[in-house]
Amino acid sequence: MSDTEERVKKIIVEHLGVDADKVVQNASFIDDLGADSLDTVELVMAFEEEFGIEIPDDAAETIFTVNDAVKFIDKASS
């Protein structure tokens, strides 16, 4: 597991209060982890703060899963 993935998972567990075992790469924030639209906005803000990046609204609207977040963050950080 990459450092980015570990940090993303930690943020998700903290913000959504879900079991870390449920936070797998293909887990959907809404369908699998029980997030609502406000939760997803808060997750994006937490990712921005944790990784020191900006996630534009149009990009945020394409981040649905743990893997989507990890891929975007890795690309934005490189």
From Swiss-Prot:
Post-translational modification: 4'-phosphopantetheine is transferred from CoA to a specific serine of apo-ACP by AcpS. This modification is essential for activity because fatty acids are bound in thioester linkage to the sulfhydryl of the prosthetic group.
GO cellular component terms attached to this protein's record: cytosol; membrane
One example of a Gene Ontology biological process annotation: lipid A biosynthetic process
Pathway assigned in UniProt: Lipid metabolism; fatty acid biosynthesis
Keyword terms of this UniProt record: Cytoplasm, Fatty acid biosynthesis, Fatty acid metabolism, Lipid biosynthesis, Lipid metabolism, Phosphopantetheine, Phosphoprotein
Gene3D superfamilies attached to this UniProt entry: ACP-like
Cellular location(s): Cytoplasm
NCBIfam families attached to this UniProt entry: acyl_carrier (TIGR00517), PRK00982.1-2 (NF002148), PRK00982.1-3 (NF002149), PRK00982.1-4 (NF002150), PRK00982.1-5 (NF002151)
Family to which the UniProt record says this protein belongs: Belongs to the acyl carrier protein (ACP) family.
Protein name (database record): Acyl carrier protein
Species this chain originates from: Bartonella bacilliformis (strain ATCC 35685 / KC583 / Herrer 020/F12,63)
